[in-house]
Amino acid sequence: MEIRNGEICIGGVSVDEIANTFGTPTYVYDEAKIRENYRSVKNTFEKYYPDFKMFYAVKCCNNPAIVNILRQEGAGADCASVNEILLAKSVGLSGEDVMFSGNFLSDDDIRQGLESGVIFNLDDISILPRLLKFGTPELLSFRINPGYGKSNVGDFVTNAGPGAKFGIHPDKVIEGYRLAKEAGIKRFGAHMMTGSCIT
C-alpha cells in the first residue's frame, strides 16, 4: 500500500476505484508485492543454502491465485489437509513440490497422500506404522519440536516448546528415522515450526 495524490493505493490502484468496481467488502492482493516478498526471502536463504526451496503454508491463505503466483516463483506448497493438496495440484504443483504436514491423519488421508506422491511430514512417530501399511514413500520428513518456541500473541499459538501440540521431541525423532530407514525409505527431511505471529 502507498499514498498517491492523497489516496490510498494498492498495486497502483486507488482503494476508491477498487471499491467502486468490486463493491465492499472485498479482498485485495498485490501480486507484485507477493512476488517481491517471496524473492527477498528466497534470495536471503539461497546465499547460505543454495539448494533452498520454500514451501508456502496454504493454510494461511488458500486463494488458488496466490498459490499459483508462488508456484510460478518456484515455491512448493505445505498442505495441512487433502483438500489443500488438491488445491496445490490444481495450480500445477506435483509430488515433491507438495509437503503434507497434516495432524491426526486418517487412513484415507494417508492413502490419498501416497497416491498424490507428496512428501509426508509426520509430527508423531505413531503415524509411521500406519503410513507404511499403505506404502513406502521415497522421501519422508519429520516435524521436530526443538524444545522452545515463541509467539507474540500468547501461548495458544506457540508451535514448539514444552506442551506444544506440534512436533516430535529430538530424543524420539532419531528412532523415527531409524524405523523409516529400516522400512526402505531412502531420503529424509527435517522440519521445524517454532513460532507464529512473531514480529
Language-model features: locations:
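ATP-grasp fold ATP-binding core
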Residues: 140-145
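Active-site loop/helix belt of alpha/beta enzymes
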Residues: 134, 146-199
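A charged N-terminal "starter" segment
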Residues: 1-120, 125-138, 175, 180-188
